[in-house]
Structure formats: C-alpha cells, structure tokens
C-alpha cells in the first residue's frame, strides 16, 4: 500500500515537473501568425495605394508611369 502511494506521488510530481518546464509555444505561434497576417495586409495596402511608377523606374505595357510617358532607352523602357 505504501509503495502504491509513493508511486502515485512520484508520478504526479514528475507530471507536474514536466508541465512546468514545458515551453508554451501556442502563444508564440499565435503571435507569429498575427505578425505574418499584419505584414501581408501592409504589403497589399502598399501595392493598392501605388497608382503609378516614378520617374526613372522601368516600365512595360502593364505598368503606368506618373508622367504617362514610357520611353525606350536601349533594350529597356523607363518612365520620364
């Protein structure tokens, strides 16, 4: 009987030690997901707010220059 009680106490003690020393990663994962979501939203918002390409940047048929002029210079085209 005493041996059974000792074994139960030892098992409870070891379980408690395991729970105390275990790294709680659930909160960290939630924070990382929130951080990634925020980063993606900022990226989408920055792309949506940019309406035209600045002077000197490369341009093509699917991009719009702020000046409205995309001029070829050698092999590439640049916004004026």
Swiss-Prot record:
InterPro entries recorded: Conotoxin
PTM info: Peptide predicted to begin at Arg-51, but it seems more probable that it begins at Cys-52, since this position corresponds to a dibasic residue cleavage.
Organism superkingdom: Eukaryota
A single MF term (Gene Ontology): toxin activity
Residue pairs linked by disulfide bridges in the UniProt entry: 52-66, 59-70, 65-79
Entry-linked Pfam families: Conotoxin
UniProt entry keywords in alphabetical sequence: Calcium channel impairing toxin, Cleavage on pair of basic residues, Disulfide bond, Ion channel impairing toxin, Knottin, Neurotoxin, Presynaptic neurotoxin, Secreted, Signal, Toxin, Voltage-gated calcium channel impairing toxin
Compartments, as annotated in UniProt: Secreted
Keyword Metal-binding assigned: no
Family membership noted in the UniProt record: Belongs to the conotoxin O1 superfamily.
UniProt remark on domains: The presence of a 'disulfide through disulfide knot' structurally defines this protein as a knottin.
Task of the protein: Omega-conotoxins act at presynaptic membranes, they bind and block voltage-gated calcium channels (Cav).
Protein name, per record: Omega-conotoxin-like 1
Organism for this UniProt entry: Conus capitaneus (Captain cone)
Biological classification of the source: Eukaryota, Metazoa, Spiralia, Lophotrochozoa, Mollusca
């Amino acid at each position: 009987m005493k041996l059974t009680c000792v074994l139960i106490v030892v098992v409870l003690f070891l379980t408690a030690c395991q729970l105390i020393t275990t790294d709680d990663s659930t909160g960290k994962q939630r924070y990382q997901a929130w951080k990634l979501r925020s980063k993606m939203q900022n990226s989408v918002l920055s792309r949506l707010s940019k309406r035209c390409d600045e002077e000197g940047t490369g341009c093509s048929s699917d991009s719009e220059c702020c000046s409205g002029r995309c001029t070829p210079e050698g092999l590439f085209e640049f916004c004026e």
